[in-house]
Design a protein with these regions (language model features):
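Gly/Pro/Ser/Thr-rich low-complexity, intrinsically disordered segments predominantly at protein N-termini
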Residues: 2-214
Length: 214
């Protein structure tokens, strides 16, 4: 039997097992954002990610290294753009993004408006985003696409889902019933900017996935 670790009401599997299953919600229990923050504070060295969606606690294991590479490259590109067009600030998780009372997420990469960054840069809880980016992992794909998406669509003007296996980005906006599928290039034109953020989607995946010489 696989070893299991209990944290309050949540059973955690070792990373090598958890990577093969979906994100695990706590059962028979509704959580609050305050309780989830306390759980994070009580486990500062834990590798799982804790998120709250519609009162359910989601626990995600540590991601693969290629996931981290995708996050790092996206952050670098967004920050480069925002240095030229200072209309926001880009960061990565772990960060507490509380968009609703029962929606506390840790998007892989996110952009907050400049006014929000000025408000929270010495605090902890982010409440407004311009863009949320999730990079799919085997353990989180279903929840990034289905469970968390409505919360992002209600509160964020752009939600990007990066699919490393398919080499595409799904772009969701608040009124969308289906995503825009982007495989070659994409643009994001935030309010107040003089020029859009332009992403060579194919080039991005080449940089993330293809080792030198391939």
């Amino acid at each position: 039997m696989a070893e299991r670790h209990i944290v309050r009401d949540v059973a955690l599997c070792p990373v090598e097992i958890a990577e093969q299953i979906m994100v695990m919600p706590a059962v028979n229990r509704r959580w609050t954002a305050k309780e989830v923050r306390e759980l994070i504070d009580a486990n500062p060295l834990a590798t799982p990610r804790y998120e709250l969606v519609d009162g359910a606690l989601l626990v995600t294991p540590a991601p693969r290294l290629v996931h981290q590479e995708a996050v790092a490259v996206m952050l670098l590109l967004l920050r480069g753009y925002l240095e030229i067009e200072p209309v926001g600030h880009a960061l990565t998780s772990p960060s507490d993004v509380e968009l609703e009372e029962e929606f506390l997420s840790q998007p892989d990469v996110f952009v907050m408006p400049l006014a929000e960054w000025r408000r929270v840069h010495r605090e902890r809880i982010v409440r407004r985003l311009s863009v949320a980016v999730e990079v799919l992992s085997p353990s989180s794909a279903g929840h990034d696409r289905v469970r968390k998406r409505p919360g992002y669509q209600r509160n964020v003007s752009e939600y990007w889902i990066v699919d490393l296996d398919a080499r595409l980005i799904e772009r969701w906006r608040p009124s969308d019933d289906r995503p825009e599928i982007l495989t070659q290039s994409m643009e994001w034109f935030p309010p107040g900017a003089a020029a859009p953020f332009r992403l060579d989607v194919a080039g991005y995946f080449h940089k993330v996935l293809d080792l030198p010489g391939e």
